[in-house]
Amino acid sequence: MLDRRSLLLGSLLLASSFAYADAAESGGMVTPMPTPDGGIQPQAAVDARGVVHLIYYKGDPKAGDLFYARMAPGESRFSAPLPVNSQPGSAIAMGTIRGGQIAIGADDRVHVAWNGSDKAEPKGPGGNPMLTTHLNAAGTAFEPQRNLITWAGGLDGGGTLAANHTGDVYVVWHANPDRDGEENRAVYLAHSADNGRTFGRERRINSVPTGVCGCCALRAFVDRAGDLFVFYRAATAKISRDMYLLASSDRGATFRSEKVHPWNINACPMSSSSLTQTDTAVQAAWETQEQVYFADFRPDGGRRTGPIAAPSGGSGARKHPVVVANGKGQTLLAWTEGTGWSRGGALAWQVYGPDGKAVTALRGRQPGVPVWGLLTAFAHPDGGFTLLY
């Protein structure tokens, strides 16, 4: 069996395969790219210096590994990958919505959180752990993974994390310690005030008893003003699977709750969502009834514009939306089509102008999303977008 050092040394040989063309050089505003190294479920974040940080998944969908690579401004290649999880096989890709999440904290420290697989250690109360780690100060390796669940166990759908430049790191998951149905699930937060070195005990943050869709993922985000947002799908009475946005202006001490979009369905859609920063607002993207939408929100969580639906056309149910804005006020909305349990599909996208209207010429679709695949995207200084699948 290869140890972690062998994996790292071997990964150096793969660096030459991580080439990426600049969006402006690719002949189009949106450049679709497969995840490097044959990985799936890419997740990207861009730091204050313009460095793109990427994590992705490889291995057995039930018990695999996360890897990390970065690309500096002006470069066209991602670095050789580093292993993220310290215990091999402790991540999970099956179901699509339980994989790794990435955030950039103080001093551009990279933080990662993920739902632990059945093999993952240390275990938490109620089973699978909610795991986290961060890149060391030298940027050469990740610290040993830690479980943050101390009492709110019963993990199911994907957890998430967010961070800011002042040292706050927020890891969020939904759980049901009493195991009495998803209509009684709640959202829990573990907060670090020292850039991920230590975390406080988790506490419930949604005061409205909405329940939480058991096998749906959460998404957290900190805007440039330091406000914290958490986007989740409810499961009220097992039927009302509406999207809710929680917003906090006091570093997660208190939250306001805003119902964003209704959806009555007596089933779990296994959905994910997206949050991003624009020049003037926070944008959210989500799925409702096999369609994807996005909207702008104020710091208090109230909606400013939208929801705006993706244009008609395509083939298959639309899922797993991603939204990202560039410096010109344009928005890229991307999503998968035809994906499902143990089934890949296509990726599709639409660029919207600063007025919120779809630019017909900046629309696309192509096959290639692998089984258990997700999308991620980032904007370039020239306004172009790279869309990873």
Pin down the residues of each PLM region:
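Short alpha-helical segments used as structural interaction elements across diverse proteins
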Residues: 1-2, 230
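N-terminal export leaders
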Residues: 3-8
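Extracellular, repeat-based ectodomains that mediate carbohydrate processing or recognition
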Residues: 21-389
